[in-house]
Amino acid sequence: MKPTVWHHLRLCPHGHPDETIDDAAIAVDETGTIVWLGAFSALPHGYAHWQREDLHGAWVTPGLVDCHTHLVYGGTRADEFAQRLAGVSYEEIARQGGGIVSTVRATRAADETTLFVQAAARLQPLLAEGVSAIEIKSGYGLDLASERKMLRVARQLGERFPVSVYTTFLGAHALPPEYAGRADAYIDEVCERMLPTLADEGLVDAVDVFCERIGFSLAQTERVFEAATRRGLPVKLHAEQLSNAGGTALAARYRALSADHLEFLDEAGVEAMKAAGTVAVLLPGAYYFIRETQLPPIELLRKHGVPIALATDHNPGTSPLESLLLTLNMGCTLFRMTVPEVLQGVTRHAAAALGRADRHGALEIGRQADFAVWSVGSLAELAYWIGRPLCEQVVRGGATVFRRMNG
């Protein structure tokens, strides 16, 4: 790759629309590393003979980060959509053997190739919206072989597509049918066999649990956290989505990277998150799709200065969402977040939720040149338009990996 100066651009280096540089330039060396950025008029003479890329006044932001997804799974759950419209609750569907467990059956039945092809089709719309880093959870296998299969597919997506994939082991997502009535025995399997084996195989970057009355108890969640800590793996948590179970305070005790959903989070939980440096990951797609009415405590999170991230929560049952830009709009319209909040929520704060704030979510000297080029007049348009293709170009490591074709 030739050293290149990207110029005639409007730069938002940290995802905050109030911190921008008009008529900016970014100098990227042959390794794909940013070696200079700032006002084009101040470009050092040493870069005068480098190759030039004129962006014609387009906006440039860091590559976006989708920090909570369940992208790898078999089948769909379209049939449950009609049930919910008829008034059946998500919890009741789960008790009837639907919900997560129905996806477990489909995922176990699918081979790796099938799972890869299906997940790749879900990933590509996100990449076309400027996503350069994504988290992918397991949790639809619920046995060692199937969880391994999911995590292997997630790793393969990162190898085959221009995106950084971070894997999360979510073995404690639901109770598999063969362990009905034996939740503690299943947690034994998760902690003593599944997690150690998959971690030793290099398939796990973090560990998550679904802590809820239809999921796992605080005591069971803590056992998984202890097992992850022994392996030196960071933890995160699905918490307070359907009730205030106290999971967020537990997550904070283990200095979790993030606590996610949080509709029923109280002020004590918010204070614990702030003290621990835990990021609040809000998932408006799930809130919208299952027609929740309890809003997450945005004002409390603001009051205590807890960083807020947004993610698609792409999954087959509660958020079949393949657009991080639509997530921005939902964050504004449903959760009453501001444009600066939602933009930082898919850049620097989303990177922090993955424990990767040093690699993603900002454009700085010394970092890899991962950025998105936007055909908008203002950054507010990223959260304003619904369904319009706004991403003109995606650059990863200084190389263009996506360019929208016009006409």
Curated annotation (Swiss-Prot):
Cystine bridges: none
Q: How is the cofactor bound?
A: Binds 1 zinc or iron ion per subunit.
**EC id:** 3.5.2.7
Please identify the protein, giving its name as recorded: Imidazolonepropionase
Which NCBIfam families does the record match to this protein?
Answer: hutI
> Which keywords does the record carry?
Cytoplasm, Histidine metabolism, Hydrolase, Iron, Metal-binding, Zinc
Its function? Catalyzes the hydrolytic cleavage of the carbon-nitrogen bond in imidazolone-5-propanoate to yield N-formimidoyl-L-glutamate. It is the third step in the universal histidine degradation pathway.
**Cellular component per GO?**
cytoplasm
State the top-level EC class. Answer: hydrolase
Q: Which GO terms describe its biological process?
A: L-histidine catabolic process to glutamate and formamide; L-histidine catabolic process to glutamate and formate
Q: Which family does it belong to?
A: Belongs to the metallo-dependent hydrolases superfamily. HutI family.
Annotated residues that bind Zn(2+) are located at 68, 70, 238, 313
Q: What is catalysed by this protein?
A: 4-imidazolone-5-propanoate + H2O = N-formimidoyl-L-glutamate
UniProt-annotated binding residues for N-formimidoyl-L-glutamate: 140, 315, 317
Q: In which pathway does it act?
A: Amino-acid degradation; L-histidine degradation into L-glutamate; N-formimidoyl-L-glutamate from L-histidine: step 3/3
Cite a single GO MF annotation. Answer: zinc ion binding
Q: Which cofactors are required for activity?
A: Zn(2+); Fe(3+)
Write down the Gene3D superfamilies for this protein, in alphabetical order: Metal-dependent hydrolases, Urease, subunit C, domain 1
Question: For binding 4-imidazolone-5-propanoate, which residues are annotated in this chain's numbering?
Answer: 77, 140, 173, 241, 318
* Residues reported to bind Fe(3+): 68, 70, 238, 313
As for subcellular location, the record says: Cytoplasm
